[in-house]
Regions:
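Histidine-centered active-site microenvironments of extracellular/periplasmic hydrolases
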Residues: 5-9, 184-185, 191-233
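Flexible, surface-exposed loop regions and adjacent strand-edge segments
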Residues: 148-151, 206-208
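A long, amphipathic alpha-helix that forms part
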Residues: 111-120, 149-191
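A generic fold-level signal
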Residues: 31, 124, 160, 183, ...
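Active-site/pore-lining binding-face segments in mid-to-C-terminal subdomains
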Residues: 196, 230-231, 244, 257-261
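Active-site-proximal alpha/beta segments of enzymes that process anionic O-linked groups
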Residues: 1-148, 224-226, 248, 252-280, ...
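Active-site rim elements
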Residues: 44-45, 155-163, 176-177, 214-218, ...
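C-terminal, low-complexity/hydrophilic appendages and adjacent surface loops
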Residues: 222, 289-306
């Protein structure tokens, strides 16, 4: 992402409008189910309490809630997150089965149901939390695009990945415009639930260079966990970059702080956006075992992208 120093300008909206940028945010896990189950429920890396989650937290605080999803509603990788989503007051899934089954749908198709929610008035003393769960750059990134990717390097998988970042940035711009037209103050919190790394099997076992490999899930590299977390607010100006290290295991605390909710069950909810590093930085591997971040390997950008 250009917002985080990438050379191609694939985030023009965030470059201009991001007010708070967490430079060193790490996802709770290496894939969507692990990351969101531990990041959006009362967990902190231990047993998951799925009934205490971001939706129930918001509802208990009196917020109207909506969950709009371009991910799957059913399946091995989707049902657990879907169970959280269906606790919201308003629920829309573009897909009725798994994320990779049936007719392809694209993230910008969530704008219409978003607009429908925004058109439903709320009492003047009530707020609303709207969650948009998108596909973003999920493998295979070429499947996330409605058109051929632009050419940046001689690797189409990489080209598609770059263009999905640009596509997500454009989606955030559309959401921002819709919120502006609502005439109400608003705040947007954007984050990714995991990163990707170059697939070692595709370049170590097939005698090709790393720059020609594809991007996949893994739990061995820092890049599998290093993710964007950005706030865009109608009442903020300028851009603040926070270099504090944060694990997605504290994400629910961060969402609570963003929403202005305080509870003893979320001990980090008053300091998630502080400039102090988390004391013990851990993430979860594929087996949901805690591993220290400083033990992760590095998967740097290939030379043709520097």
């Amino acid at each position: 992402m250009h917002l985080y120093g990438f050379k191609y300008k694939d985030t023009p909206f965030l470059d201009k409008h991001a007010n708070i940028v967490m430079n060193n945010m790490l996802s709770a896990g290496p894939n969507t189910p692990i990351s969101l189950l531990h990041g959006l429920t009362l967990s902190h890396g231990t047993s998951i309490n799925i009934q205490n989650n971001v939706i129930t937290l918001a509802k208990k605080a009196g917020l109207d809630t909506a969950w709009l999803s371009n991910q799957g509603a059913l399946g091995q990788y989707d049902t657990s997150i879907s169970s959280i989503a269906h606790q919201a007051n308003h629920v829309t899934f573009l897909k009725t089965t798994g994320y990779d089954f049936g007719i392809r749908s694209f993230d910008d198709q969530l704008i219409a149901p978003l607009q429908k929610i925004l058109n439903q008035p709320l009492p003047s003393n009530r707020s609303r939390l709207i969650v948009l769960h998108i596909m973003g750059s999920h493998p295979n990134p070429c499947d996330r695009l409605p058109q051929q990717a632009h050419h940046y390097v001689d690797n189409n998988n990489t080209n598609c990945y770059i263009d999905t970042i640009r596509q997500t940035d454009n989606l955030l711009s559309q959401i921002y415009t819709a919120l502006q037209h609502s005439g109400q103050p608003f705040s947007m919190l954007y984050f990714s639930d995991h990163g990707l790394s170059h697939d070692k099997n595709s370049y170590e076992k097939n005698s090709i260079v790393r720059s020609e490999s594809i991007l996949r899930h893994n739990d061995c590299f820092y890049q599998n966990y290093h993710v964007p977390l950005v706030i865009v607010s109608s009442d903020l100006t300028g851009q603040l970059r926070n270099k504090a290290q944060r694990s997605g295991l504290e994400l629910l605390d961060g969402v609570a702080q963003w929403l202005g909710i305080s509870t003893p069950q979320l001990p980090y909810s008053e300091k998630f956006f502080s400039k102090l590093n988390s004391s013990q930085l851990h993430v979860l591997d594929f087996h949901q075992r805690l591993q220290p971040v400083n033990k992760l390997q590095n998967d740097p950008l290939p030379a043709n992208l520097l």
